[in-house]
């Protein structure tokens, strides 16, 4: 586990299982036209999945208390922490 500091909160980032990491990586969907990506969907769902599975105590109340910037920052921190072992 790793301590992570947001603006006015401290959280603990958990080590996730391979299944949870795969789930989070598979949430975003890309739509192609020919060889070009024209849309990426489910980005908010993916961000929430990373936070919910990768942060200790990340229930709805906690997630709703975060600003959009904090959600983005925390989601990226969770992903980076999971990649340390790769």
Can you say where each PLM-predicted feature lies in the sequence?
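Short, surface-exposed, charged amphipathic helix/loop patches that serve as local interaction elements
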Residues: 9-86
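Short acidic-hydrophobic surface loop/beta-edge motif
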Residues: 1-9
